[in-house]
Design a protein with these regions (language model features):
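Helix-turn-helix DNA-binding elements, focusing on the entry/boundary residues of the two helices
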Residues: 28
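Short Lys/Arg-enriched helix C-cap and helix-to-coil transition segments
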Residues: 53-68
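Positively charged, aromatic-accented nucleic-acid-binding surfaces
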Residues: 1-25, 34, 39, 64-118
Length: 118
């Protein structure tokens, strides 16, 4: 499957997000930027997510990035959402409100409209 890069940007953060296999993928370095938390805090949440709710093999991919000889861990949207509901930060609150709105729209309307694309 083709790997695409999209830009995610809000008031506080701008990230290059990898899209592959019908999901988004972020590195362990990008997730702390998304939620404005320390890498150690995010690492602990990821560890707990894999111990308590998600399978590591299907939610983690090692991928090559530009200008690096090493493979880098990328975590899919399921991990990002699980961490987002655990992390305590202003960006975490923004993320949870956004995720709740998306879920609510799906439950009530059966679909979500991307207002930016209209």
């Amino acid at each position: 499957m083709k790997n695409e890069i999209i830009i995610f940007e809000n008031q506080n953060v701008k990230l290059e997000v990898s899209m592959k296999d019908e999901t988004v993928w972020l590195t362990q370095a990008q997730i702390p930027k998304l939620f404005d938390r320390d890498v150690g805090v995010i690492s602990r949440h990821i560890k707990n997510v894999f111990e308590e709710e998600l399978d590591e093999k299907s939610n983690l991919q090692k991928m090559q990035i530009a200008n690096s000889d090493k493979l880098v861990n990328f975590y899919n949207l399921d991990v990002i959402i699980s961490v987002g509901y655990r992390v305590k930060s202003k960006n975490g609150v923004i993320f949870r409100k956004w995720a709740n709105k998306i879920l609510k729209d799906y439950l009530i309307k059966g679909y979500v409209v991307n207002e930016k694309r209209l």
